[in-house]
Design a protein with these regions (language model features):
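Extracellular/periplasmic catalytic domains that process cell-envelope and extracellular macromolecules
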Residues: 6, 116, 148-150
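Short, P/G- and charge-enriched loop/turn segments at secondary-structure junctions
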Residues: 71-73, 139-146
């Protein structure tokens, strides 16, 4: 596989809604990421509230009202995460790594950029038997999108300038009354994988982060 050059600068994206996580939790993760990664130039925290005592390295961004809905943020749903793909929410001047707040950092996560095929690649862990591959892409086309390889959205490598369609299409589906009726929208990671199937790349499970077991069993 041809790989792209690792970026000299990248942005780390975190999301937070509800009351489970505090500024302390966010700050600990920011510190750990900064300690282990030499090229992280920006931390963006997308949240439904203002966090007091937030690490000064963090740029707070409000969760857009259109994504701040109970059906996107409660009952185990994380569709609010898709807001990071909305046009203008993130600066499009550098690639990004999104990471869940309950992730333990075991090393330099910026190495994940090495797995990209090109700048448009979205890199995630596999979460299903069907791997991201030429076969999966063929199956996706032959079944008109009914069969596709899926990733785990606890860790996502992407470039904001290429993927505003993820948010745009999702909101169009929601406004058409097809949310959760259209099967790929039953979870944010299924939906990302469905939209970006042709550009999905898998991270090896040995990569230097650790998630709670339940996140890897979707």
């Amino acid at each position: 596989m041809k790989q792209t050059e690792r970026p000299k600068k990248w942005q780390c994206v975190l999301t937070c809604w509800g009351t489970k996580y505090s500024s302390t939790d966010i700050n600990k993760l920011i510190t750990k990421i900064a300690e282990n990664n030499h090229h992280v130039a920006r931390f963006v925290v997308i949240s439904d509230r203002v966090h007091k005592d937030l690490d000064p390295r963090a740029e707070p961004v409000g969760l857009p009202d259109i994504f701040n809905k109970p059906e996107f943020t409660t009952g185990g749903q994380c569709h609010a995460k898709l807001s990071m793909f909305q046009s203008g929410l993130l600066k499009a001047d550098m690639p990004a790594i999104y990471i869940d707040l309950d992730t333990a950092i075991l090393g330099p996560i910026e190495q994940a950029f090495d797995f990209r095929k090109d700048e448009k690649s979205i890199v995630m862990f596999q979460s299903a038997v069907l791997p991201f591959s030429a076969f999966a892409r063929l199956l996706f086309r032959l079944t008109k999108g009914k069969r596709y390889a899926r990733g785990n959205s606890s860790f996502v490598v992407f470039h904001p300038k290429y993927w505003t369609e993820i948010a745009d299409k999702f909101l169009a589906i929601y406004e058409a009354g097809e949310f959760c009726k259209f099967r790929p929208t039953i979870s944010d990671e299924r939906y990302i994988s469905w939209v970006a199937q042709d550009d999905m790349v898998a991270l090896p499970n040995s990569f230097a982060v650790k998630f709670p077991t339940e996140y890897m069993q979707h």
